Amino acid sequence: MTNIRKSHPIAKIMNESFIDLPAPSNISAWWNFGSLLGICLILQILTGLFLAMHYSSDTMTAFSSVTHICRDVNHGWMIRYMHANGASLFFICLFMHVGRGVYYGSYTFSETWNIGILLLLTVMATAFMGYVLPWGQMSFWGATVITNLLSAIPYIGTNLVEWIWGGFSVDKATLTRFFAFHFILPFIISALAAVHLLFLHETGSNNPSGMMSDSDKIPFHPYYTIKDILGLLFLILALMLLVLFSPDLLGDPDNYTPANPLNTPPHIKPEWYFLFAYAILRSIPNKLGGVLPHAMSILILPIIPMLHTSKQRSIMFRPLSQCMFWLLVADLPILTWIGGQPVEYPFITIGQLASVYISSILLXLMPIFGIIENHSVKW
């Protein structure tokens, strides 16, 4: 009798995706972040669902409904902080996952890579709209400033911003539609994640060496399921440490003040995971001139496969490219720090230097070093 997991139509799909899936025998802990992102998504959907049961998307009651969740709902404070800090861990896993893709040359799987970029943009949009929902000072002013960036688009910009707002300023219509989109987008992300996995399983997974591994594969279960469970335990530990000991560590104190359109906070900034892009935006003292590099900070990812000049896929055996990659990684925390600082000297200058540095590494130095490395091994 055939095993049910190999004969049942639904169980067979699960079996081929998570149990009998042939996986390279040498993939490292950097390949754990895909499964961790799946866990983060499930966690965010579940905690978000419970929060939505008590949340009111009206400008008059939104702030007090969040207060009510924290004070009066059973374990409401825990659900709220799990959702907020879960988003931070989601982005940490996302950045690690993308970084691994760049380091080991996973971007050569073009369909998987492009769906991944679409996923990243959708998650960023979802997180931004979620930040607006508590209707604190930073929620209101963050929404005003970030949506206003679209007014830099020639001719249609102003109309586009007012269409998104649903009026002439961020108000009740904006909050209601942001809540609706914030609720539906995680389900769209789930569908995109399924497509991402579908394309990945068409080609098979990459591995640290960047070489074909068809001759050396092992079943996903039990080897990598155990490995993923270990990663999950570390993720839960990090989340619980944040939620139970420092729930507001990654938040903004201004968001504990109800939104007031008549009082601008001294320093408007988005959540920490957007600060690197925000620093690039502020480094150019021109609206359109700042918006274009700001957009390119993410939209450079689809261009990376075109800039791949090396005959080796992975950076693992390319010392010059390794130096450039780790300098790039070191530059991102600097940009994140600058994005959270006031717009004054010396932060403006540091931000400008870091922005030029990141673009020169990605657009020029990495491709040049790829060619140099080809010649150094006489390829």
From Swiss-Prot:
CDD domains with a match to the protein in the record: cytochrome_b_C (cd00290), Cytochrome_b_N (cd00284)
Residues spanning the membrane: 33-53, 77-98, 113-133, 178-198, 226-246, 288-308, 320-340, 347-367
Amino-acid positions noted as binding a ubiquinone in the UniProt annotation, renumbered to this chain: H201
Residues bound to heme b b562: H83, H182
Source organism, top-level taxon: Eukaryota
Subunit architecture: The cytochrome bc1 complex contains 11 subunits: 3 respiratory subunits (MT-CYB, CYC1 and UQCRFS1), 2 core proteins (UQCRC1 and UQCRC2) and 6 low-molecular weight proteins (UQCRH/QCR6, UQCRB/QCR7, UQCRQ/QCR8, UQCR10/QCR9, UQCR11/QCR10 and a cleavage product of UQCRFS1). This cytochrome bc1 complex then forms a dimer.
Subcellular location: Mitochondrion inner membrane
Gene: MT-CYB
Protein name: Cytochrome b
Keyword set includes Cell membrane: no
Cofactor(s) needed: heme b
GO BP terms in the entry: mitochondrial electron transport, ubiquinol to cytochrome c
One Gene Ontology molecular-function label: metal ion binding
GO cellular component: mitochondrial inner membrane; respiratory chain complex III
Comment on bound cofactor: Binds 2 heme b groups non-covalently.
Additional comment: Heme 1 (or BL or b562) is low-potential and absorbs at about 562 nm, and heme 2 (or BH or b566) is high-potential and absorbs at about 566 nm.
Membrane topology of the entry: Multi-pass membrane protein
Coiled-coil annotated residue ranges, if any: none
Family under the similarity heading: Belongs to the cytochrome b family.
PROSITE patterns: CYTB_CTER (PS51003), CYTB_NTER (PS51002)
Known role: Component of the ubiquinol-cytochrome c reductase complex (complex III or cytochrome b-c1 complex) that is part of the mitochondrial respiratory chain. The b-c1 complex mediates electron transfer from ubiquinol to cytochrome c. Contributes to the generation of a proton gradient across the mitochondrial membrane that is then used for ATP synthesis.
Xref: Gene3D superfamilies: Cytochrome Bc1 Complex, Chain C
Keyword entries, A-Z: Electron transport, Heme, Iron, Membrane, Metal-binding, Mitochondrion, Mitochondrion inner membrane, Respiratory chain, Transmembrane, Transmembrane helix, Transport, Ubiquinone
Positions of heme b b566 binding: H97, H196
